[in-house]
């Protein structure tokens, strides 16, 4: 695991993209900047924010504040995903699957930033369709939120956790 100066529980912030956008008015163009950021605690919490302002630092600050306000909790399993998941948002489709220890994060830059701040260390991920960063971020977070823990699946199916995880055949049942 990489050495960082961050304390456990402290939020990690990553800037994904900064764009210059313009609005055409009667006197010409008015330029402003947008920023897309993700924030996470490397332990299953992640949020993203999109900010817009006249100056870059203000846009980044706004997006960081929005990201901190919009955090969600993701259930992880040994530094990877519980199971393979798919996520969709408008024209972007993503697929992620768990990987064995030592694989690392094999994903595009936008997805990699999210997976790093959420605390996933081993995953295989692929984006299809539109690679617009905003859509990829939303699709990735949708996919992570759709992931279910074995406890949730067992409860939904009315079975024991050992049956869901495949330990059923190895344990004697009388």
Curated annotation (Swiss-Prot):
It comes from the Bacteria. One of its GO terms (cellular component) is small ribosomal subunit. GO terms for molecular function: rRNA binding; structural constituent of ribosome. InterPro entries: Ribosomal_Su5_D2-typ_SF, Ribosomal_uS5, Ribosomal_uS5_bac-type, Ribosomal_uS5_C, Ribosomal_uS5_N, Ribosomal_uS5_N_CS, Ribsml_uS5_D2-typ_fold_subgr. The keyword Ribonucleoprotein applies. Pfam families: Ribosomal_S5, Ribosomal_S5_C. The N-terminal domain interacts with the head of the 30S subunit; the C-terminal domain interacts with the body and contacts protein S4. The interaction surface between S4 and S5 is involved in control of translational fidelity. Part of the 30S ribosomal subunit. Contacts proteins S4 and S8. Belongs to the universal ribosomal protein uS5 family. This is Small ribosomal subunit protein uS5. It comes from Blochmanniella pennsylvanica (strain BPEN). The lineage of its organism: Bacteria, Pseudomonadati, Pseudomonadota, Gammaproteobacteria, Enterobacterales.
């Amino acid at each position: 695991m990489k050495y960082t100066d961050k304390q456990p529980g402290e939020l990690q912030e990553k800037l994904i993209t900064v764009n210059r956008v313009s609005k055409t008015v009667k006197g010409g163009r008015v330029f402003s900047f947008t920023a897309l950021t993700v924030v996470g605690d490397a332990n299953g919490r992640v949020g993203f924010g999109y900010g817009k302002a006249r100056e870059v630092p203000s846009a980044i600050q706004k997006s960081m504040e929005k990201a901190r306000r919009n955090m969600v909790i993701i259930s992880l399993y040994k530094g990877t995903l519980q199971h393979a998941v798919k996520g969709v948002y408008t024209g972007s489709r993503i697929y992620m699957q768990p990987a064995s220890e030592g694989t690392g994060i094999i994903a595009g830059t936008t997805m990699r930033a999210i997976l790093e701040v959420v605390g996933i260390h081993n995953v295989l991920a692929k984006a299809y369709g539109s690679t617009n960063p905003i859509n990829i971020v939303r699709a990735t977070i949708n996919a992570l939120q759709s992931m279910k823990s074995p406890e949730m699946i067992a409860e939904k199916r009315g079975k024991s956790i050992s049956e869901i995880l495949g330990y059923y055949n190895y344990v004697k049942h009388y």
